[in-house]
Amino acid sequence: MIWHVQNENFILDSTRIFMKAFHLLLFHGSFIFPECILIFGLILLLMIDLTSDQKDIPWLYFISSTSLVMSIAALLFRWREEPMISFSGNFQTNNFNEIFQFLILLCSTLCIPLSVEYIECTEMAITEFLLFVLTATLGGMFLCGANDLITIFVAPECFSLCSYLLSGYTKRDVRSNEATMKYLLMGGASSSILVHGFSWLYGSSGGEIELQEIANGLINTQMYNSPGISIALIFITVGIGFKLSLAPSHQWTPDVYEGSPTPVVAFLSVTSKVAASALATRIFDIPFYFSSNEWHLLLEILAILSMILGNLIAITQTSMKRMLAYSSIGQIGYVIIGIIVGDSNDGYASMITYMLFYISMNLGTFACIVSFGLRTGTDNIRDYAGLYTKDPFLALSLALCLLSLGGLPPLAGFFGKLHLFWCGWQAGLYFLVSIGLLTSVVSIYYYLKIIKLLMTGRNQEITPHVRNYRRSPLRSNNSIELSMIVCVIASTIPGISMNPIIAIAQDTLF
């Protein structure tokens, strides 16, 4: 009898929760229509996996890619609409948030074709891989529009949990397991630090959780210059620094990059940076508006450390993925310049533009690494020697992406850095910009060192991996080459037409 009553209560509670969720989706679903498309794609993937055999694998890729493209289309159709707040103030929709969501969707759309051949060759579970990628994308999109502390915590955890699972996807690989453990432990610690900072912010504002209400609460309680806010700022900066791989919270990055499957590294290297940058711009600009001098100083120190350590340590690396890990630490230091400049002097516009170029440069480089790794089984930089003699297309593609990452003209990376540094210079960040310029020169050195190896023709320097290299057919349907071509074009041509891109980015400001 007691069990029967408990069962009825459980059914009633479940029904109430379902009806409340249905009510929210019915009246607020239009605000998260791009996210709803991804959720529908996730459900379709699960249904197909449960009801079909291995012959329907192409459908899984098609559904994943289509749901991402449709989400991008939904975002573009909603462009220039008035800012809206939904879900009782938990979610905000505006152009600024939507362009970060667009960048995350773009990353995922390019990463799926980049992963197809790798998954087939390594015999990884396909459905779970795609589910984790789409769920992480969904978490990143919700993070971009998060308007309260609870959503800001839950959304990145959704992204992070999928990232942990993806990094350890090759379970038989000891390095992958090690990378997952380090990522999980350090990620959990950083989340705890972030939440501790949120608790100080919550208490100081008089119990508010919405970002704008926190700022108003700090004025009402006159706590905006209190020691509690300084403590909150330090803890939140450390937590966000981990998500961005800012020094000194960068220790996890090289190990995770080296141990994780290469397509996973490509995905994490860009999506995590975009999502965390969206979080940083909103949380520093709104609740910490009255502490702008303090967080500017904190971010300047972290950016300088990241640019110097990232680029100097990258010189000594022998693994291509570890080199790109340290390179990404330096690259995010450049992005921080745009966050510090902010609305004034087009800081956010230059940051968004550079992140768009960084996505194409980084994913193009990883596409080349995936292609080379599948044919040779190595990740050592020395083993790339003489690649041009065997596969000129792959060698030239990798060279162009690396040169663009280094910021050599007339490639997109040069114009992106130029505009970013110019905005920083106009804002008076002379020392920070000078460090950025010097470390960019350092980065060009180790990129050119790799390009020199690629183009060498001396037999004594060519390794057995390149001698036995199997080049794919010219008319191949290789999906990696599709991603590679798109990224290489995006890393070279857009730099020439910077003005329209900057103009679009300027329209995304608050």
Swiss-Prot record:
Name of the protein described by the UniProt record: NAD(P)H-quinone oxidoreductase subunit 2 A, chloroplastic
Compartment annotation: Plastid, Chloroplast thylakoid membrane
Record keywords: Chloroplast, Membrane, NAD, NADP, Plastid, Plastoquinone, Quinone, Thylakoid, Translocase, Transmembrane, Transmembrane helix, Transport
Domain of life: Eukaryota
Protein family (similarity comment): Belongs to the complex I subunit 2 family.
Free-text function comment from the UniProt entry: NDH shuttles electrons from NAD(P)H:plastoquinone, via FMN and iron-sulfur (Fe-S) centers, to quinones in the photosynthetic chain and possibly in a chloroplast respiratory chain. The immediate electron acceptor for the enzyme in this species is believed to be plastoquinone. Couples the redox reaction to proton translocation, and thus conserves the redox energy in a proton gradient.
Subunit field text: NDH is composed of at least 16 different subunits, 5 of which are encoded in the nucleus.
Biological process, per Gene Ontology: ATP synthesis coupled electron transport; photosynthesis, light reaction
Transmembrane segments: 24-44, 57-77, 99-119, 124-144, 149-169, 183-203, 227-247, 295-315, 323-343, 354-374, 395-415, 418-438, 484-504
Keyword Transmembrane applies: yes
E.C. code: 7.1.1.-
Molecular function as annotated in GO: NADH dehydrogenase (ubiquinone) activity; quinone binding
Membrane topology of this protein: Multi-pass membrane protein
GO cellular component, one term: chloroplast thylakoid membrane
Cross-referenced HAMAP family: NDH1_NuoN_1
Catalytic activity line of the entry: a plastoquinone + NADH + (n+1) H(+)(in) = a plastoquinol + NAD(+) + n H(+)(out); a plastoquinone + NADPH + (n+1) H(+)(in) = a plastoquinol + NADP(+) + n H(+)(out)
Any Pfam family: Ndh2_N
